[in-house]
Amino acid sequence: MALQTPSFLLPAAVVVLMVLSSPGTEGRDSPRDFVYQFKGLCYYTNGTQRIRDVIRYIYNQEEYLRYDSDVGEYRALTELGRPSAEYFNKQYLEQTRAELDTVCRHNYEGSEVRTSLRRLEQPNVAISLSRTEALNHHNLLVCSVTDFYPAQIKVRWFRNGQEETAGVVSTQLIRNGDWTFQILVMLEMTPQRGEVYICHVDHPSLESPVTVEWRAQSESAQSKMLSGIGGFVLGVIFLGLGLFIRHKRQKGPRGPPPAGLLQ
């Protein structure tokens, strides 16, 4: 499947040359070199769920004409672009609108498109508390969302099942060296005993949203929990050591020693 390009580049160049060679332009000062540029841009959101086609025409570093599929027609940006806009809207508008599928969608789904366009990396999500203080003190919960691709992502905070919008602060998207992204979304809060906070993440790579939970509890409760975990770990270690010693003893010699050793 070959990559497709817009089929009216030559007519566009002809229109520009006709305008530049018209009698009204002969007496004007003009540069010796003429640079004509065409840029066809396809923007994709969630794969091909939403596609936007933008076509830009540039003469000597000044954009004079643009087609945007969200607008649906050619628009002149300078006087130079007016004849082209009128001509293209009469002669090529339906063809241009169709190229949203025949060019943009076709090229996305074609075998030559690099896998980076379809790359999906699931985000890693973690919650941390900025300051380890007791309950009923102002604090900041930080939801770290890392290593995801593409860039489109939605991160929300919930407290006891209700979405929190006040006190939510987010960083800009941070680019990693491997083309993935990360972002920090913080929630200003004053934790009360028993409250449950959830960081809720939506991303194109996920079949369902990722949620990470943080529970507000007192320092004594945290200490008891850590003590319980520590006691459990020590118990497992001592149990394993006891079983190991017993196993070694069971493998030892059984019955009386050889007669020669008793003399």
Swiss-Prot record:
Gene3D superfamilies assigned: Class II Histocompatibility Antigen, M Beta Chain, Chain B, domain 1, Immunoglobulins
Residues with glycosylation annotation: 46
UniProt KW Transcription keyword: no
Cytoplasmic side: 246-263
Transmembrane segments: 225-245
Ig-like C1-type domain: residues covered: 123-211
Key words, A-Z: Adaptive immunity, Disulfide bond, Glycoprotein, Immunity, Isopeptide bond, Membrane, MHC II, Signal, Transmembrane, Transmembrane helix, Ubl conjugation
SMART domains in alphabetical order: IGc1, MHC_II_beta
Region Beta-2, annotated ranges: 121-214
Region (Connecting peptide): 215-224
GO cellular component: cell surface; early endosome; external side of plasma membrane; Golgi apparatus; late endosome membrane; lysosomal membrane; membrane; MHC class II protein complex
Location within or outside the cell: Membrane
UniProt xrefs under InterPro entries: Ig-like_dom, Ig-like_dom_sf, Ig-like_fold, Ig/MHC_CS, Ig_C1-set, MHC/Immunoglobulin, MHC_I/II-like_Ag-recog, MHC_II_a/b_N
Entry's Gene Ontology BP terms: adaptive immune response; antigen processing and presentation; antigen processing and presentation of exogenous peptide antigen via MHC class II; antigen processing and presentation of peptide antigen; cellular response to dexamethasone stimulus; cellular response to glucocorticoid stimulus; cellular response to morphine; defense response to fungus
Cross-link Glycyl lysine isopeptide (Lys-Gly) (interchain with G-Cter in ubiquitin): where in chain: 251
Protein's recorded name: Rano class II histocompatibility antigen, B-1 beta chain
